[in-house]
Design a protein with these regions (language model features):
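Gly/Pro-rich turn-and-neighbor structural signature
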Residues: 2-82, 204-251
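Long, contiguous internal "core" modules enriched in hydrophobic/ aromatic residues
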Residues: 121-240, 245-250
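Short linear motifs in low-complexity or flexible loops
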Residues: 255, 262-265, 270-274, 283, ...
Length: 312
């Protein structure tokens, strides 16, 4: 079967356009565009479209990038777990996204959807697979945001023809893949991660393609409602300090100059860090969060009904 590379390219570019258009409408600032290409004779040939935002009204920095590259020979280092593919011509294309909001109540997010093929040689056919996923990294997490993200991830798997077993496998894979062993903690609250979809020959091309693009198509429904809910900006010292705390794991020991102690988030007064462990939490429809993730005290009071402090 001839692989529909041109069709895949068009679909990845359409996904990039849709995401960037929606994010520009949300932020109010345009993404910068950089079209690039690799000339003939380079080890890697191909082209791509880089879309970047920096110092936006809402997003401090982010990128949504498309690339389509080809090579004449897969190096052995790239085929450690598939040594039989070494030396074969290859092709890879996909979309990758990272967004860092200014507001620490809004999480950083990552999305990647991709396709890879090691082309046929004299004796072997094409070997192809899809991969990707999306995951959320809150600085100041809220249970309802995490549940919404995971629920939409599950909806993506269902929309692509997958079942609950597939969803649980990809969710668990994401938790393992983004676990920081040197800190003995997860990076963020997870989401979906998958790779080698179709490589075993048990998943037809159309089914693997449908699942992969369902994940990409559910990125905006998974993320935009969260940032819209958390769009109002917190006090300036929270923006300046809390992002630094979570990006560098360094706390502050008191209010900023000119600040008032009553304005300090409770967690800063207690420990100088907003990090708390999330106990395991399962919703009625089976969404599980909290396998070692961190939960802010405001969320703990919300869960238990204690306290009356308003949420941001």
């Amino acid at each position: 079967m001839a692989l529909p590379i041109a069709e895949l390219r068009d679909r990845f570019l359409a996904l990039q356009r849709e995401i960037v258009s929606s994010l520009e409408a949300f932020d109010g600032e345009p993404f910068h565009t950089d079209a690039w290409s690799r000339p003939a004779g380079d080890r890697l040939q191909g082209d791509g479209l880089t879309r970047l935002i920096e110092n936006g009204r809402f997003f401090e920095r982010g990128g949504c990038n498309f690339s389509h590259v080809r090579g004449a020979s897969l190096p052995p280092s790239a085929t450690a777990h598939r040594q039989e593919l070494a030396g074969r011509p290859f092709e890879a294309l996909g979309v990758s996204l990272v967004l860092h909001p200014r507001n620490p109540y809004c999480p950083t997010v990552h999305l990647n959807v991709r396709f890879f093929v090691a082309h046929s040689n004299d004796t072997q056919p094409d070997v192809w697979w899809f991969g990707g996923g999306m995951d959320l990294t809150p600085y100041y997490p809220f249970v309802e945001d995490i549940v919404h993200f995971h629920r939409t991830c599950r909806d993506a798997v269902h929309a692509g023809g997958g079942d609950d077993t597939c969803y649980r496998e990809w969710k668990t894979w994401c938790d393992r893949y983004f676990f920081l062993k040197h800190r003995n903690e997860p990076r963020g609250v997870g989401g979906l991660f998958f790779d080698d979809l179709g490589a075993d020959g048990n998943t037809p091309f159309d089914a693997a393609q449908r699942l992969t693009f369902a994940v990409g198509d559910h990125f905006l429904p998974a993320y935009l409602p969260i940032v819209a809910r958390r769009r109002p900006r917190p006090p300036a010292f929270v923006v300046d300090g809390l992002v630094t705390v979570e990006r560098g794991h360094r706390g502050r020991v008191g209010p900023p100059v000119g600040g008032h102690l009553d304005d300090m988030p409770e967690d800063h007064l207690v420990r100088g860090s907003p990090r708390r462990r999330v106990e395991r939490h399962r919703t009625r429809d089976g969404i599980v969060v909290g396998t070692g993730h961190h939960l802010h005290p405001l969320m703990q009071r919300q869960r238990t009904g204690a306290g009356t402090r308003a949420q941001p």
